């Protein structure tokens, strides 16, 4: 579950106050002429079902928890992509790609006889949707194949790039995912044009349905993604709807390099790129290829793939002007190349940027761009198809921004002065771009994986000791029980450690024990004062064990935190009359502060965690909506979310010891009391008079106050789908089932980042 859901051609607006699901036909939504902004308006066909949110927009949407079901995968539940990929002869694949790059096809000719620049753009735009605020987007899943990305204005004509690659995909089949193939092709393109890449890691599994991610509140492509204060709306990274980063003509099409620099810094920063990485990527990427604007997009270009006729077979942007391809190709409407050698890696982009004075002009397609003031540059660039023609180089407004912004200018000049520095910076920035969404290095596979640990990969130390055995685990459990730590303290700490995980980009989780490091140790949701108390006691247990004579066996604090949570759950289950053993697999390690980028980890901080009844007032979405968002990040299903909330409440595991939703007379006992008491019709619920978001449950006969609950608590009785699941767990015969299901869901969360176990 990588993103917000997409089921059928319906748009799910996560960012609206009620996460409205708006029903629209794909044809109406995605009929877009490249440079035009077509309103996205509702359109219905007879017989099309309306969603619940169509009739009741405030109704909680649970579809994020039903996304990417196993039933959608044609390869089957038993298929292991990693094992299949590891049987691949990567060298042979790269040779096949290299041949394809220089084998032009009549149906879509190659500029300068080389598809390399085209495929770099494909790989870049596939990976460039990643955004650090929520970890969504990126190359994994190959979402560029699906709506809406396959029909975004910024992805115009990349449908042809993927079709050109089909013979390679067809040849290697299930051994090579589209996600890996597109990134690998970008690497091979760079390498065949004289650039040494930093490396390549495989392991991206493909999705089989679109992610329906919140891309902005605008109802038109190219609409502004900024809020009323001019700030880029979080969690977005692109400045305008339908773009990967920024408008190359300038903000909202205005050719202002200074304003463009601000947009670039904000957009690239939202994808975890600093100024040096940003300049390296722009300068490196624009070393190659050309822009395409032979004529006006609005006059010549047809609908995007999602709105094209069925006979087009998934292709879009059909160009009716001239031959519609090659020298007549239209993509962005901008036209021209940045350098005189667009199919080889050089420093010409930087030389031209600083070597000429640039003036505004317009492309044949009517787009605003820049050309050298000096007429001597008019014959500098060869034509992509006709050797007898020459052209001046061109620049986008966003290129000129690198010259005008003081920080970007300083970096760009240093790259121009030192080409080796430029190469190294571009190699590392490109590697980060196309691997940023893959998570830690333990998820990297293949012979070209770099050996170096990079800070943005959230590195972990290697295990240098023997793992504890069952006897050791039993002994450690007894020591935890004797420590004086309570069930709620143990459960809260383990949950805080493990539930930092994001299924979107595979960051966070219990491995590394980063809950003891900045910034996690200071997050309000983790109750810093209590957390320190718990960690101090667990560390003393760890030290005593590791200093003892255990034949080289040691326990990490990361493992001990999870084991402590398990002990708490087991004790609570035993008190309920259902003794269980929570699964535990040692193997976690402890990161150090030097391996933990505070700024990078700050975006993982939960502003709401319904499982601990925590909600910060700064949130734009409701507590119930934020619960679903958090559950989707944890890859949970509706039943798993339900049983975990009910269990966490009776375990008294709320943040700050809040008693909201602790609907039991026996806190610390793993009973189904939360559901029994929530659904008890002898209790009447009403809004609390003094506190927004708090509800009071009074006895219907005596009016005595029984309970207090939050929106998150009451949603399990209010929402019809959640109530149906809650009724299962509230039933008299469900007490043991509740315990078993809670333990299974708990163990799932505790092991979300144990990629080693998942591969087994």
From Swiss-Prot:
Pfam families: peroxidase
NCBIfam families referenced in this protein's UniProt entry, alphabetically: cat_per_HPI (TIGR00198), PRK15061.1 (NF011635)
Designated name of the protein: Catalase-peroxidase
Gene designation per UniProt: katG
One CC-aspect GO term: cytosol
GO molecular function: catalase activity; heme binding; metal ion binding
Active site, per annotation: 125
Assembly and oligomerization: Homodimer or homotetramer.
UniProt entry keywords in alphabetical sequence: Heme, Hydrogen peroxide, Iron, Metal-binding, Oxidoreductase, Peroxidase, Signal
Tree of life domain: Bacteria
Root EC class: oxidoreductase
Binding site for heme b: 286
Catalysis performed (reactions): H2O2 + AH2 = A + 2 H2O; 2 H2O2 = O2 + 2 H2O
Ranges annotated as spanning the membrane: none
PANTHER family: CATALASE-PEROXIDASE, HYDROPEROXIDASE I, BIFUNCTIONAL CATALASE-PEROXIDASE
Cofactor binding summary note: Binds 1 heme b (iron(II)-protoporphyrin IX) group per dimer.
Family statement drawn from the similarity comment of this UniProt entry: Belongs to the peroxidase family. Peroxidase/catalase subfamily.
Cofactor dependency: heme b
């Amino acid at each position: 579950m990588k993103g917000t859901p997409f089921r059928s051609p319906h748009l799910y607006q996560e960012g609206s106050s009620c996460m409205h699901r708006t029903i629209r036909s794909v044809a109406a939504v995605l009929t877009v002429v490249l440079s035009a902004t077509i309103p996205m308006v509702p359109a219905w066909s007879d017989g099309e079902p309306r969603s619940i949110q169509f009739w009741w927009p405030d109704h909680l949407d649970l579809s994020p928890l039903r996304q990417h079901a196993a039933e959608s995968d044609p390869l089957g539940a038993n298929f292991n992509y990693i094992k299949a990929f590891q049987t691949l002869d990567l060298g042979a694949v790269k040779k096949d790609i290299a041949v394809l790059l220089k084998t032009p096809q009549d149906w879509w000719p190659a500029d300068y006889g080389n598809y390399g620049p085209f495929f770099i753009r494909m790989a870049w735009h596939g990976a460039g949707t990643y955004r650090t605020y929520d970890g969504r987007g990126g190359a994994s899943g190959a979402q560029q194949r699906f709506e809406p990305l396959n029909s975004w204005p910024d992805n115009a004509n990349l449908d042809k790039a993927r079709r050109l690659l089909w013979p390679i995909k067809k040849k290697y089949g299930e051994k090579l995912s589209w996600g890996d193939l597109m990134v690998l092709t970008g690497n091979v393109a760079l390498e065949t044009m004289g650039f040494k890449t930093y490396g390549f890691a495989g392991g991206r599994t493909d999705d089989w349905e679109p992610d329906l991610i919140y891309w902005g509140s605008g109802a038109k492509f190219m609409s502004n993604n900024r809020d009323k204060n001019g700030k880029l709306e979080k969690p977005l990274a692109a400045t305008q709807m339908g773009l990967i980063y920024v408008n190359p003509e300038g903000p909202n099409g205005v050719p202002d390099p200074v304003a463009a620099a601000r947009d670039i810094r904000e957009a690239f920063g939202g994808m975890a790129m600093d100024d040096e990485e940003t300049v390296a990527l722009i300068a490196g990427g624009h070393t190659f290829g050309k822009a395409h604007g032979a004529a006006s997009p609005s006059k010549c270009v047809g609908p995007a793939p999602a709105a094209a006729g069925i006979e087009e077979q998934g292709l879009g942007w059909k160009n009716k002007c001239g031959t519609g391809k090659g020298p007549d190709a239209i993509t962005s409407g901008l036209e021209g190349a940045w350098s005189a050698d667009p199919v080889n890696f050089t420093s010409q982009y930087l030389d031209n940027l600083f070597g000429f004075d640039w003036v505004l002009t317009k492309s044949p397609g009517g787009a605003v761009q820049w050309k050298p003031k000096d007429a001597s540059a008019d014959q500098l660039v060869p034509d992509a198809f006709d050797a007898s023609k020459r052209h001046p180089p061109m620049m986008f407004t966003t290129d000129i921004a690198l010259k005008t912004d003081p920080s970007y200018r300083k970096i760009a000049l240093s790259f121009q002065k030192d080409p080796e520095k430029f190469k190294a910076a571009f190699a590392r920035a490109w590697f980060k771009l196309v691997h940023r969404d893959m998570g830690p290095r333990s998820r990297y596979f293949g012979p070209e994986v770099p050996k170096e640990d990079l800070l943005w990969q959230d590195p972990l130390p290697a295990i240098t000791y023997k793992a504890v055995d069952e006897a050791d685990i039993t002994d450690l459990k007894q020591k935890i029980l004797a420590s004086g730590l309570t069930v709620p303290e143990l459960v809260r700490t383990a949950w805080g450690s493990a539930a930092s995980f994001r299924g979107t980009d595979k960051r966070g989780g219990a491995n590394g024990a980063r809950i003891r490091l900045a910034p996690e140790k200071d997050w309000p949701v983790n109750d810093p004062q209590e957390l320190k108390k718990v960690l101090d006691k667990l560390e003393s247990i760890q030290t005593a064990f590791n200093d003892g004579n255990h034949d080289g066996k040691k326990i990490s604090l990361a493992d001990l935190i999870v084991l402590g949570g398990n002990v708490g759950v087991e004790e609570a289950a035993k008190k309920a009359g259902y003794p269980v053993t929570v699964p535990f697999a040692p193997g976690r390690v402890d990161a150090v502060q030097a391996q933990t980028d505070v700024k990078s980890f700050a975006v993982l901080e939960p502003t709401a965690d319904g499982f601990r009844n925590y909600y910060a007032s700064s949130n734009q979405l409701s507590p119930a909506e934020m619960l679903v968002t958090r559950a989707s990040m944890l890859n949970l299903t509706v039943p798993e979310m339900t049983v975990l909330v009910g269990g966490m409440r009776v375990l008294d595991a709320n943040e700050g010891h809040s008693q909201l939703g602790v609907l039991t007379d026996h806190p610390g006992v793993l009973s189904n009391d939360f559901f029994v008491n929530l659904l008890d019709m002898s209790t009447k619920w009403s809004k609390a008079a003094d506190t927004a978001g708090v509800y009071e449950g009074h006895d219907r006969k005596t009016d005595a106050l029984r309970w207090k609950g939050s929106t998150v608590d009451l949603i399990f009785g209010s929402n019809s789908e959640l109530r149906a699941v809650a009724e299962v767990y509230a039933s008299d015969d469900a007490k043991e089932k509740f315990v078993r299901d809670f333990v299974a869901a708990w163990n799932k969360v505790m092991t979300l980042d144990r990629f080693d176990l998942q591969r087994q």
